[in-house]
Amino acid sequence: MRTNSILSSLRTAIFSVVFSVCLGAVSEAQTYNILHNFGGSGHDGYAPLTDLVLNGNTLYGTTASGGTNGGGTIFKINTDGSGYGIIRSLTNSPSPEGGMVLIGNTLYGTTFTGGSADNGSIFKMNTDGSGYTELHSFSATVPSVFGTNSDGNRPQGDLVTDGSTLYGTAEYGGTNNNGTVFKINTDGSGFAVIKTFSATFLGTNNVSENMLVNSGTNTDGARPIGGLVLDGSTLYGTTYHGGISNGVVFAMQTDGSGYTVLKYFSGINGIGTNSDGAAPVAGLTLGGDTLYGVTVGGGVAGCGNIFKLKTNGAGFIDLHDFLHSDGAFPRNALFLNGSTLYGTTAAGGSSNYGTIFMILTNGADFTTLKNFDMTVGLQCDSKFVLSSNILYGTVADGGTNGGGVVFGLTVQPQILTGDGNFGVQANAFGFDITGISNQAVVIQTCTNLGSPDWLPIQTNTLNGGPVYFSDPQWTNYSGRFYRLRSP
């Protein structure tokens, strides 16, 4: 069980020393469990690149390669790691790289390649593996695989749905080869392109994470990789190229009207840095009237950042700049729980294989929860899903067989040292506690860590935001330690 301990004392100097030891910015004692190692025997899948779908106690996902035909797989696994099975081996090398969406007992998704022109497709299938149907095949591009067409090419963002219509993005293709936003009914009818991104005019190219950050400018953005967010009749998304320099955040209506750029990301200098981030590869996360996202480049160290802005485009704030030591190049959408954001980076951290992190929505208390390495997996390419207090995701590489893993991270409650509630207030010593919503937390205390006799002094339930704990008895002790436990 993860334990957070703090010492309260009459002397502030003692506080500072003990807090810096006990509550640093790395919290590696989270419980990380590998549920499945890909790349094993029996034509197993390889390289899971997409988000998982949770239905009850069952997780569904895809791999980009492997399977009987080498074209990737669709799999299921229970949240306790049992019941792993491939429910579909894909043919013709379609390589699914976008997350699926579940409606009833039907899964809907996209493939990056495959289809009649090998430019990707939209499919559906039942959760038992039956009824696989190709709903749309993206058309041929001229003059080459990365040329132009009418409907888009190479979809890899997650689909979203209002129940009867699916919405998604294609990175390439369209009339200017800068990608499209499309919609299609769940029965395969009514496919329509509702946005074609305009032509870009080439400027100075810069490189971040071995990819071009600036491939030209236009007014509306270019190359949408991430999935969309649907709120009522409004879609929100990102492009990692175009705009005035390095991508945009946009909003539009589901009928294709009202396209608006909410944020233009600025240019980067010769060493890849700027003030607001560059190249948002991932999709957005919506919380109330606020959008949260990440960029893969730019920021103060050229390693990307975490940002937020209002749904009307106002109030852009850089919440955190990655420094490589705490992670680098975040490529996946954030997961929001209460007032805490959880996410991953593709590189950086102690082993340079990426990290799992948490941060409050106000930018406080950034914490590294897990450093990836070859044994536990590397290159996390999925947004989290939550069950109880466990975050589930996939890693595209590493693990026992080198084919990536499905993992679960048990998130323990955290004591927040970076906000204004930490310390002595109204003659009581107190602090904020954060964690997964509806998680019960017991605060225990003792006076001697050499022979601790931990006593429970309060139980709280986390409900959508930090819970404040205060100890009015702190002045009765020369020193007091605190820790958090589950009941």
Language-model features: where?
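Short, composition-biased motifs enriched in small/polar/acidic residues
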Residues: 5, 411-487
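Extracellular beta-propeller repeat domains
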Residues: 2-420, 425, 436, 466
